[in-house]
Structure formats: C-alpha cells, structure tokens
C-alpha cells in the first residue's frame, strides 16, 4: 500500500537521522560545548534532530486529525516544565517524559516519538547537553505508544510492569549516552544518589550507572502511572476532543 509505505519510510529515515545525530555526540569536542550554536558540531546535531522531528510529523499527516498533530508540542511543553521544576532537586526522578507518555497513549507511537524529539529540539535550542539524549526520548515515545495500542495500560499491575520495563530500557540507553557522549560525567541529576552509590562501591563509573538505572526505573514507573491517571480522570468535555477510533479504549 503506497499510502502507508511512504509513512514507514519517513519514520525509518527520522530514526536513522536521530541515531546519526547521536553518533556525532561521541566526538570528544561535543562534551566541552555548552551552548548549542557556538559550535558547528552541536548546531549540526540540533539541525538533524529538527529534520527528524519534522519527518515524524509529516508521516502522520492525513492519518490523524490535524488537531492531534499539535499534541506533541503541548506534550513537549509539559516535559520541559516538569523537567525544569525537578532538575535542581535531589529527587531521583525527572518527570521530563510525562508529556511524551500522554501523547503516545493518545496519538500512538510515532507522535509519541515526535514528542520526545520535539522536547529535545526545544530544550536543546540553547543548551547542547540535552541533544545527546534524543534516542531515549524516541524510545520512550515508541514503547509507550506500542504498549498503549495493545491495551496494556488497562490494569494497574501492567502499568507498573510496563513502567519498569521502559525504565530499564531508557536507563541502559541513558548510561550509554553518559559514557560515550560525556565520558561518564553527568552535568545534572540526583548527585546525592550518585555519591551514595560511590561511597558504597568506591567506583565512580559504577555509581553513575547505578544512579542512572535507579532514577530511570523509578521515573518511568511514575511517568506512565501519572500519564494514565491524567487521561483516566480527564473531564469528559476535554477527553472528547482527543478521543478517536484508534484510542477509544
């Protein structure tokens, strides 16, 4: 079917561009740049991710109502707001993917991925640090969207188990980003938890890995739970604006 083939191609190209952008972050000079547009390398990474996000939006044009195509922007705004509120705390969670989870449940995996990328593009328009974590946002959007399509979030136990699985996956990816893009030295996050693990194991890199896994697992369980609760108890007058055939259940 030609109508679906070109959509799949755009999604595949978008993911490939995102991976290419991440590959650019493993060069040593990337970790030394703070402001995105002060370096050709970080500016190129940002541009690749922007193109990838546009391709994801384009792949869904005509497939969902036009109003739903705007949801990733609102989801990204939620991510940035909640993320900025928690980034300076020592709480071992981030809450910067709640918007991604909400949109992925409503609109499916592709627009969930678009929400994750939009968050990265907007958040990385000035600070280059966030750009390296683009694959994590894509993974979360895709995973939540696919699980939602299979009705996994209808039971609390499955919500928790799904959050654990997504947390482990995103945690492993985040650890790889920290090691390869930033030589194992995060610039933000719950440093007290990292110091706690380092005190116990006397190994800085192991402490960073354990902190990343712990934080991501806890964060994603609560992220999915919050997203499901928001949609479950959304007033009907609002819910009817985003309820369509494929997400009615």
Region locations from a protein language model:
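Membrane-interface helix-boundary motifs at transmembrane edges
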Residues: 2-3, 57-67, 147-158
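Membrane-embedded alpha-helical hairpins and interfacial helices in multi-pass inner-membrane proteins
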Residues: 2-50, 83-90, 130-132, 152-249
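Membrane-interfacial loop-to-transmembrane alpha-helix junctions, especially the N-terminal start
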Residues: 6-11, 64-71, 110-112
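Histidine- and aromatic-rich ligand-binding microenvironments
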Residues: 8-11, 51, 57-62, 140-148
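Helix-loop-helix hairpins and the membrane-proximal interhelical loops
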Residues: 50-77
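Alpha-helical membrane segments and adjacent membrane-interface helices in multi-pass membrane proteins
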Residues: 76-148, 158
